[in-house]
Amino acid sequence: MYQPAAPSPHLTADLFSVLLLCLADGNLLVFTAHVDSVLTSKEPLGAFCSPEEVKATADTELPDLYPAKYTLELESRNIYKMDELYPMPRTSGNQHPHTLHVTHPYDYFWFPQQKLARAILACFTFAAARARQLYGADTVTPPEPVAVQCTFSDVKSFGFLAYQLNTLDLREDNGIKNQVWVDGPYDLYESCNHETGLEGFSPIAFQRFLALYKNGLAA
């Protein structure tokens, strides 16, 4: 008996997602995340945590940034579009976000914290925009968490993270929180140049990369 195979995961390059959130103080935040590529799948990734574990995040205290304000490094604009975007249409066979790939050009210096923050922001923006696409523009708490994975890399290293969107309510510090798990970054090699070639190759990064790719995908 012939059984049609499920569509294979699809890799699309150079995508961005847009999310708008209005906070309790009246500030409208426009999140725009650009990624180098996105692996999408027919079925969504399963939640990384149980409902009980998600509920327990309400007891987690967030760091106090005072006297710094959360908009300190944000650019203020008076002209913007009120359009949210998740780049994959709901009619697509592979519409669910699986793994985002974020690279950091070597011609600009990035601190490790900046690389990680950029990856987390990309996960939040893509997952939240997907939740709004699925459940409506007014969605605050999606009925099901939206899970997404991400790799972030430069010339020499790879880092990995898993992100679970539980809420879009950023107005208060109480209530359930979103969750992120970070692994790495891991160096791919010790040195690489034209004279000696590649030295000190480490397979760990590729092992992690393969694990993320295979997670939730049919064999």
Task: Set out the residue ranges of the language-model regions.
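Arginine residue identity/basic-tract feature
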Residues: 77, 90, 118, 130-132, ...
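Metal-dependent nuclease catalytic regions and adjoining charged, substrate-binding loops involved
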Residues: 132-211
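Short connector loops at helix/strand junctions that flank enzyme active sites
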Residues: 32, 117-119, 145
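Acidic, metal/cofactor-coordinating or nucleic-acid-engaging core segments within structured domains
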Residues: 108-140
